[in-house]
Regions:
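Polytopic transmembrane helical bundles with strong interfacial aromatic enrichment
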Residues: 1-138
Length: 138
């Protein structure tokens, strides 16, 4: 589409959604307002769906390129991030289904995983950005 690989069009959504969800959840945890987790929960679900698409399109691009250490590290980081986001989404959905999440304001395992995913998505974004700059010759 527009001679731009599909991966480049999809990948920005899970990056933004993951970082926004982590910020909202940490803010809700610090302020002891568990009801604020609802919006972050929705963002994490969409981020997980976007990450799954980004993983698929990224692996397709990796198959078309010669192996380079930067591309391999970026792919591994993206896969880890995507899988963690999917796990966070599933854990949060399970907690919501049990109505567990809205009654406690303790540090939940999914919050730790979500912050890890947000940091990993930033690392993945930076390595991807460097690869794009290299492809453009800058």
């Amino acid at each position: 589409m527009f001679e731009v690989p599909l991966h480049f069009l999809i990948v920005h959504f899970p990056i933004a959604l993951t970082v926004m969800a982590a910020v909202l959840d940490v803010r809700a945890f610090v302020a002891k307002r568990p009801e604020q987790h609802r919006m972050a929960n929705v963002l994490v679900r969409w981020a997980a769906a976007g990450a799954a698409l980004a993983m698929l399109t990224g692996l397709q691009l990796l198959g078309d390129r010669r192996q380079s250490s930067g591309a391999t590290f970026h792919a591994a980081s993206g896969l880890i991030t995507g899988l963690v986001l999917i796990a966070v989404s599933m854990i949060r959905y399970s907690a919501e289904a049990r109505e567990h999440e809205s009654t406690r304001s303790t540090l939940e395992p999914w919050l730790v995983l979500e912050v890890f995913a947000a940091l990993a998505v930033v690392v993945t974004a930076l390595t991807g950005h460097r690869m794009v700059l290299e492809m453009m010759g800058k």
